[in-house]
A protein has these predicted regions:
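Flexible, charged surface loops at secondary-structure boundaries
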Residues: 1, 69, 116-121, 168
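Small-molecule-sensing regulatory modules
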Residues: 1-46, 53-54, 61, 80-86, ...
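Structural signal for conserved beta-strand scaffold positions within catalytic alpha/beta enzyme cores
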Residues: 38, 93-95, 108, 126, ...
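Short beta-strand-centered segments that line the small-molecule binding cleft or hinge
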Residues: 61-105
Length: 262
C-alpha cells in the first residue's frame, strides 16, 4: 500500500484533524503517500435547522460514508461524536488516535459583564440539548455573579463563523468543545496563516472558563477522532492498528454502548 486517499469535511477544523491523523500515520509509515480530499455534507450545507431538529443522524457523516462505500476514498476522518450510533455493516471505525481534552469551554464577552450583573440574566449560544441541560446549574452556581435567568439560543456554522456571530450579536456567552479550540490554535501557521490570529483576537474579547466534566459530562467520543474504513479492507485495518490508541477506543465504544441502552 503506497498511497491513501483521506476524506474529511471541508471546514478548517476537519482539515486540521485529517492532517493530524496523517502526521501520526507518516511517523509510523514514512514512505506512504497521502492525498487529502474534502467534501461538504448535508449538515454543512443546511446552517439554519438546529441539529436537534434535523431529520436524521449522521448529517455530518453519511455523505462522506457514501464516498467511502463507492471507493472514492480509502478512509474518512471524523469527529467521533458526529457519528451515528449505528454506522451499518459496510464500513467500520477501525481506530482512534490519542483523545484530546473532552471538556467544553464557556466564553463570555467582556462587554456583556455589566449587563449580566444588572439584569441577573445571561444569553448563551449552544445548539446542544446536553450542554443546555448541564449548564443551567453550572451558570447559576459557579459564575461570580448572580444569575436568575438563562436563555439558550441555537447557533450553526464552523468555529470561527460561530465565534463571529457571537461577538457581533447580542448574545453574552458561547459554549464550544475545548478540543476544537485547541486544535485550531495548534494548527500549522503555514497552512492556516490567518486562522490563529483571528481566533486569538476573538478570544481576547472574552473571559472564559473550562467547564468540569463533573458538572458537564461530555458526549461519548468528544475530543477523539474516528478513522472509518470499508469493513472488507483488511489490509488497511491491519496497517492502521499500529497507531490505534486501544484504551481511548475502548472508552469511546463503551460510552456509545451506554447511549444505545437508553
Amino acid at each position: 500500500m503506497k498511497k491513501l486517499d483521506i476524506l474529511s469535511r471541508k471546514s478548517d477544523l476537519a482539515v486540521i484533524q485529517a492532517h493530524e491523523f496523517g502526521e501520526v500515520l507518516l511517523s509510523k509509515y514514512p514512505s506512504l503517500k497521502l492525498n487529502y480530499i474534502t467534501k461538504s455534507t448535508s449538515g454543512d450545507i443546511d446552517l439554519k435547522t438546529p441539529l436537534s431538529q434535523m431529520p436524521s443522524e449522521g448529517v455530518f457523516t453519511n455523505d462522506l460514508r457514501d464516498e467511502l462505500i463507492n471507493k472514492n476514498c480509502d478512509l474518512i476522518i471524523h469527529s467521533w461524536k458526529d457519528l451515528p450510533l449505528d454506522v451499518g455493516n459496510q464500513t467500520e471505525v477501525a481506530i482512534t488516535l490519542d483523545r484530546a481534552d473532552p471538556r467544553d469551554l464557556l466564553f463570555i464577552k467582556k462587554n456583556s459583564l455589566q449587563k449580566i450583573k444588572q439584569t441577573s440574566s445571561i444569553s448563551i449560544f449552544s445548539s446542544s440539548p446536553r450542554r443546555q441541560y448541564n449548564l443551567e446549574s453550572f451558570v447559576k452556581n459557579y459564575l461570580p455573579f448572580q444569575i436568575k435567568n438563562i436563555i439558550f439560543e441555537n447557533i450553526r456554522g464552523n468555529i470561527l463563523t460561530r465565534f463571529k456571530k457571537f461577538l457581533d450579536g447580542n448574545v453574552d456567552g458561547f459554549v464550544v468543545a475545548k478540543a476544537a479550540i485547541d486544535r485550531l490554535l495548534n494548527a500549522n501557521q503555514t497552512d492556516f496563516p490567518d486562522l490563529k490570529n483571528n481566533l486569538f483576537l476573538h478570544i481576547s474579547q472574552c473571559l472564559w472558563t473550562v467547564i468540569p466534566l463533573s458538572v458537564n459530562p461530555s458526549s461519548p467520543g468528544q475530543g477523539a477522532l474516528a478513522v472509518e474504513i470499508r469493513s472488507d479492507d483488511t489490509n488497511l485495518k491491519k496497517l492502521l492498528s499500529e497507531i490505534n490508541n486501544e484504551a481511548d477506543y475502548a472508552n469511546v465504544i463503551l460510552g456509545r454502548q451506554e447511549l444505545q441502552k437508553d
